Regions:
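Single conserved hydrophobic/aromatic residue that forms the stacking wall/gate
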Residues: 2-9, 13
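Central hydrophobic cores of alpha-helical transmembrane segments in multi-pass inner-membrane proteins
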Residues: 20-29, 53-56
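"…together with the soluble PPM/PP2C metallo-phosphatase catalytic core" -> "…together
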Residues: 36-169, 174-189, 193-196
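Interfacial/capping segments of alpha-helical transmembrane domains
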Residues: 11-19, 66
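A residue-level signal for conserved active-site and pocket-lining positions in enzyme catalytic cores
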Residues: 1, 27, 106
Length: 196
């Protein structure tokens, strides 16, 4: 059934993001201290992105020697997992359904996908916030992954997801990440420039 396939793909996507997140968190814990934080953060970011690309490339090269069908199945699953648009569309639909039931439910639901205070939003503002989030994330979740798939295949798409995860974890301008995450944030800007 479609629901079972979608659930399996969702589980793979969550594991992938958690795996990327653990690598980034470990690297940040080891390297984000002392001097040369910009250099250390940049080297970690580049190493993770290039590492994911080559690991994926070599993985499919080895698997492809044994089974073209298995290769195609795994690639299809990864492509589906990397496209986060369906999850976000579902979340936006849930916001619309919640706000139709009650304004308070709508505010709570939209708070899950926006990064601002939703307690004073009107019903129309709740819907607008959900749609704005969908539009903003369409590039990161659908357009850019497809672009990098077209340019560099599944390894490129996976490397892009690492770029995106790095930016979402360390690409902030606060005291902790201003230096360490600045190169990750710039790489994300470059990776999204053409697709956006």
């Amino acid at each position: 059934s479609t629901r079972v396939r979608s659930s399996a793909a969702s589980d793979v996507y969550k594991r992938q993001v958690v795996g990327f997140g653990k690598l980034i968190a470990w690297g940040e814990k080891c390297l984000n201290a002392g001097r040369a934080r910009v250099w250390k953060g940049g080297m970690m970011s580049v190493a993770l992105i290039v590492g994911v690309y080559f690991f994926t490339f070599l993985f499919f090269k080895v698997i492809g020697e044994y089974s073209i069908i298995l290769t195609a199945l795994i690639q299809t699953l990864l492509i589906f997992c990397c496209l986060a648009g369906t999850t976000l569309i579902r979340e936006v639909r849930m916001v619309f359904e919640a706000v139709d039931r009650s304004l308070d439910e709508g505010r709570k639901q939209v708070a899950r996908i926006v990064g601002r205070d939703t307690s004073a939003l009107s019903a129309q503002e709740v819907r607008t916030a959900a749609l704005e989030t969908l539009a903003e994330n369409l590039s990161d979740g659908v357009i850019a992954p497809l672009f990098w798939y077209a340019v560099l295949g599944v390894p490129g798409m996976m490397a892009y997801k690492m770029v995106n995860t790095l930016d979402s974890m360390i690409g902030y301008r606060n005291e902790r990440y201003r230096q360490f995450g600045c190169i990750a944030a710039r790489i994300d800007d470059v990776a999204n420039y053409i697709p956006a």
